[in-house]
Amino acid sequence: MLPAVVLALGMITSLAPPWLAAETGMPAAPAARCEALAARLRVAPRLKPVVADMCRRAPTFRRQVVRLTQQAGLAITVEPGDFPIGGRARASTAIARVDGGLRSADVLVRPGDSLAVVELIGHEFEHILEQLDGVDLGAWVGHNGVHRVGGDDSAPIETERAQQVGRLVASEYAAAGAATTALRVR
């Protein structure tokens, strides 16, 4: 006779809608679906393993990828960038609009340890989502967690929303890694 845990797992997996994979052509498992969708992004070869790992370990990142890849005509590039060592910037996103719609978002992240890169990618993806949500950052500067990084009016804008989401993605990523490591030790 099978242990109750195995039976329970069998019941849980049987609850997944079998039509999902057939109708969309996408894997039904969230991590696999995220990886398939992330393949639509232009990710530098050295960052592809990190993005794939983020899909497996961070549910918030999976939601970001689903939403970003659903936006018709939006091209997203993720590459390592050169940022001054002593400078405050660790990442940036250049967004291009055509006829008011987002057409491209070029994300640059400072190379480093994987957890820092994970936080930066999640953070920058949230900036793209802010734009898709129609947030007028210029109008919000100085209010509700929106500020310029630097002294003048042309300085980049930072948001508390992107900072929090970047930290959330990194914490999910780290927690999943710790859980995986703990499972291997047992």
Q: Where are the regions a protein language model picked out?
A:
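N-terminal low-complexity, Pro/Thr/Ser-rich intrinsically disordered segments
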Residues: 15-55
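Acidic/histidine-rich, surface-exposed loop or edge segments in extracytoplasmic proteins
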Residues: 35-37, 41-49, 101-109, 142-149
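Post-HEXXH active-site segment of zinc metalloproteases
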Residues: 115, 131-161
